[in-house]
Amino acid sequence: MDFPIPQKTGPQKIALEARGLSCIRDDRVLFKGLDFTLKNNQVLLLEGKNGCGKTSLLRIICGFREQDAGELLWCNTAIKGSNYYAEMAYVGHLDGVKKELSVLENLKMSLALSQAGKYTIDQALDKVQLAGYDDSLVQSLSAGQKRRLSLARLLITKKTLWVLDEPFTSIDKQGIKLIESLMHEHISNGGMIILTSHHDLVLHEADVQKINLSACH
């Protein structure tokens, strides 16, 4: 599937900037002196062998751990002094859904904590091919369906930056095409995406930055 070059729309002059980021784990330097700037309509793909620090960098970007050196800026302001976390959504390996709740209850809970996005709950469920699963308990869903539910959470909330850790895990070919379509739609509307993936992205090359963390020691 080939996507057209995104028409640049949506919010402008928003940027996430890393300056000299370093991360140390168990006395081992995962990466150091890392710089990047991500703007509207762009994707940042993190590459590298297992254990090179891809997930650790995502955790720093999401505020789950502190960097050992350097700084992260959102619109030229340190992220802790900005509205950064209100603008960021994270989907990790565990999907981040409550297994004891229904599909609908999970989405209502997400919506209560965030500003509403362009999709209603019904529209989002239809978009990710979970229409009719409103009352289904999450614990009864397959791994792929749980991943689709996580994607629905992105659609119903208004977030500029999506941070995705291996989003194509547990997804079939149809689901891969769905995720690629949603990513293209998001950056076309002024969004930004940071992700790790072993899957070849089907997006316009000019909109994708790549960082190989294996080379950042």
Name what the model sees in each region.
Residues 62:
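Helix-to-loop junction immediately C-terminal to a conserved catalytic motif
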Residues 67-86:
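Conserved ABC transporter NBD signature motif
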Residues 94, 99-115:
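Q-loop/switch helix immediately C-terminal to the Walker
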Residues 118-134:
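Conserved ABC ATPase "signature" region
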Residues 137-143:
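Conserved ABC ATPase signature
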Residues 151, 190:
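Hydrophobic anchor residue at the start of the ABC signature
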Residues 162-166:
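Catalytic Walker B motif of ABC-type/P-loop ATPase nucleotide-binding domains
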